[in-house]
Amino acid sequence: MEKLRKFFREVIAEAKKISWPSRKELLTSFGVVLVILAVTSVYFFVLDFIFSGVVSAIFKALGIG
């Protein structure tokens, strides 16, 4: 039981060391994440569009679809 108490005391001590970001830092990081997400989404959309067109052309040339 003493080990469990020690564990929780150490967890609380470590939790007190956490430094939370300021509102400005949080919003800046959030904005960066949104921009990267949007760019990545557009990138994969374009790749999907290109590959689906290529595959459709191949299937059409082979008379499959």
From Swiss-Prot:
Topological domain spans for side Extracellular: 52-65
Keyword terms: Cell inner membrane, Cell membrane, Membrane, Protein transport, Translocation, Transmembrane, Transmembrane helix, Transport
GO terms for cellular component: plasma membrane
Subcellular location per the Swiss-Prot or TrEMBL entry: Cell inner membrane
Sequence ranges on the Cytoplasmic membrane side: 1-34
Pfam families xrefs: SecE (PF00584)
GO MF term (any one): protein transmembrane transporter activity
PROSITE patterns: SECE_SEC61G
Residues that span the membrane, as ranges: 35-51
Gene Ontology process terms (BP): intracellular protein transmembrane transport; protein secretion; protein targeting; protein transport by the Sec complex
Topological category with respect to the lipid bilayer: Single-pass membrane protein
UniProt keyword Translocase present: no
UniProt xrefs under InterPro entries: SecE_bac, SecE_sf, Translocase_SecE/Sec61-g
Recorded superkingdom: Bacteria
Subunit structure, as described in the record: Component of the Sec protein translocase complex. Heterotrimer consisting of SecY, SecE and SecG subunits. The heterotrimers can form oligomers, although 1 heterotrimer is thought to be able to translocate proteins. Interacts with SecDF, and other proteins may be involved. The channel interacts with SecA via subunit SecY.
PANTHER family (alphabetical): PROTEIN TRANSLOCASE SUBUNIT SECE
Similarity remark: Belongs to the SecE/SEC61-gamma family.
Role this protein plays: Essential subunit of the protein translocation channel SecYEG. Clamps together the 2 halves of SecY. May contact the channel plug during translocation.
Name of the molecule in the record: Protein translocase subunit SecE
Organism for this UniProt entry: Thermotoga maritima (strain ATCC 43589 / DSM 3109 / JCM 10099 / NBRC 100826 / MSB8)
